[in-house]
Amino acid sequence: MSRQVVRSSKFRHVFGQPAKADQCYEDVRVSQTTWDSGFCAVNPKFVALICEASGGGAFLVLPLGKTGRVDKNAPTVCGHTAPVLDIAWCPHNDNVIASGSEDCTVMVWEIPDGGLVLPLREPVVTLEGHTKRVGIVAWHPTAQNVLLSAGCDNVIMVWDVGTGAAVLTLGPEVHPDTIYSVDWSRDGGLICTSCRDKRVRIIEPRKCTVVAEKDRPHEGTRPVRAVFVSEGKILTTGFSRMSERQVALWGTKHLEEPLSLQELDTSSGVLLPFFDPDTNIVYLCGKGDSSIRYFEITSEAPFLHYLSMFSSKESQRGMGYMPKRGLEVNKCEIARFYKLHERRCEPIAMTVPRKSDLFQEDLYPPTAGPDPALTAEEWLGGRDAGPLLISLKDGYVPPKSRELRVNRGLDTGRRRAAPEASGTPSSDAVSRLEEEMRKLQATVQELQKRLDRLEETVQAK
């Protein structure tokens, strides 16, 4: 009798653990807008989520440790005039976040350490160029201040946030229909896109050339998502002709046939893939699902190995994914998701069971740090570079906020004041606060005089 051989993997027993109630973010009004993005973005300092707003678009930004019930009057980022569709934290500055909206603009915001105390209406810079709603924003992984946006005008624009200028444009001749997803390669030299015309494309954005493309990676008519994974491969999620959800792995040099194709179920939600390059694990989260599936990618056939599935009772309206430097390494946490319910945001930790409390070097190889490897000018000049790596052995402490400087020719002073590295406010911010205090004091004095006159009138009668 033959014996079944079980593949050996240190990630076979990874399990998901939802946070306790007091570690969740309660009473948040998650956006009801229909759009296939995660609606949530997190980093080691903040959690941001797109929320319902009357008369425009807004998203909520909370310090990571500020859990519990969120006040209904909590300040939001509310500068857009139409619903926000996508948000993304800058990988090189944990205080900077970009947002794309139905108002056809991209806005870049600077969040002070400690979070917002007043509504934030003025962005650091507004990026205008799209003619229809902007549904995707994605920062370059290694070049400073390089931001990509994709709109329903079938245009991809690459911006230098430091100047507020569009430096590259991929027009409708590249994507003749709605763009479903865009993902940067690890060194930022390529992007892969999925489009409503049922094609997945690999593009060199600086040359505006399509390096490779695959027609109908999935036979179904519903949206396809595509991301770069290990060794330059691409992973796609989509639907079969019979509306079964699928996940497929492709070699970028040979897109004729998939390296692996697996059918999952018959649910209708689009699967959002999240890839961890340190562990080669990809997590699939479906909007409207109540589960997270995860697979390990290897360099040998069959390449894509199912590991397990985390399930819960309530379905998810969106999902955020924490960068590796924001995890608790002393608990063997290899991933953390932020699941959006209708009125709640729930952290879910993915953990490898280990008995030792010591640092597990095999689980935590050097990972991408917060410093950029290139300037925007170097990348535009043709250079590529992988991320600058850091060790998590001694833990990670987020640095103080760094001011985002925008130079727009004569408009060099247009930027929000932020705390400097020393933690003290800038002189401009102090001057503005002092002026506001003087105005408030004058108003109080005037009101007091009116009250005194009113009392005298009443007493005279």
Swiss-Prot record:
GO cellular component, one term: cell cortex
InterPro entries named in the record: Coronin, DUF1899, Trimer_CC, WD40/YVTN_repeat-like_dom_sf, WD40_repeat_CS, WD40_repeat_dom_sf, WD40_rpt
Cell compartments where the protein resides: Cytoplasm, Cytoskeleton; Cytoplasm, Cell cortex; Cytoplasmic vesicle, Phagosome membrane
CDD domains assigned to the protein according to its UniProt record, in alphabetical order: bZIP
GO BP term, example: actin filament organization
WD repeat positions: 13-63, 73-110, 123-160, 164-204, 207-251, 258-296, 302-349
Phosphoserine: residues carrying this PTM: 2, 422
Name of one Pfam family that matches: WD40_4
SMART domains linked: DUF1899, DUF1900, WD40
Region (Disordered): 403-432
GO terms of molecular function: actin filament binding
Post-translational modification N6-acetyllysine, affected residues: 449
Protein name as it appears in the record: Coronin-1A
Organism annotation: Macaca fascicularis
